[in-house]
């Protein structure tokens, strides 16, 4: 087996990834497949921090667009990420991966509070850490939470697993002539307004020189390929 090129990564999963083809909620077969893929990377010797979105259950941005108070909507979205975190913890432990959930909003009965040094200690002890509740603040996306946590745990890379096989110059679902980038700079992503992550998350990565690899989660084995340094998806650097 190839040696991983990264010792510690931050894996960002969208909430929608857990929903499978049904589009909402949590699909058992889908979450099992994701857990198997994450477990393969873990068993290759990579320390993994994981940030999960909540869009399969609740989208704060969408609710605020319909007139709901944005802060309230965002807090509801944060709680949705915690539901996903617990589901993912269960799925990962079934694959033999020791997992801890830390949340940015305290909920002591179901998860640890987020404490940076404790998170790093878990990683050093080869436990996978799932970070729930985003940053704990409204108006910040889970992409921004991923950038923040990646820097806090000293991850070498953010791996953003999506439903698309990389970054294109326009939406490949709508444009047959869309061109895929193998590599692209942070500033190009911002200038072109490409929907990789929100601009806050990209700017944080740019300021701290943290590379982002975005790739297709729906292809089994892609997470392992990414940590082994195979060229998949798009590198933002």
Swiss-Prot record:
Residues covered by region (Involved in allosteric activation by GTP): 20-25
Locations listed in the record: Cytoplasm
Name of the top EC class for this enzyme: transferase
Keywords: Allosteric enzyme, ATP-binding, Cytoplasm, Kinase, Nucleotide-binding, Pyrimidine biosynthesis, Transferase
CDD domains on file: AAK_UMPK-PyrH-Ec
Positions contributing to UMP binding: 54, 74, 135-142
Gene Ontology terms describing biological process: 'de novo' CTP biosynthetic process; UDP biosynthetic process
Residues reported to bind ATP: 12-15, 55, 59, 162, 168, 171
Enzyme Commission code: 2.7.4.22
Enzymatic reactions: UMP + ATP = UDP + ADP
Self-association and partners: Homohexamer.
Record-stated family: Belongs to the UMP kinase family.
Physiological role: Catalyzes the reversible phosphorylation of UMP to UDP.
Name this protein carries in UniProt: Uridylate kinase
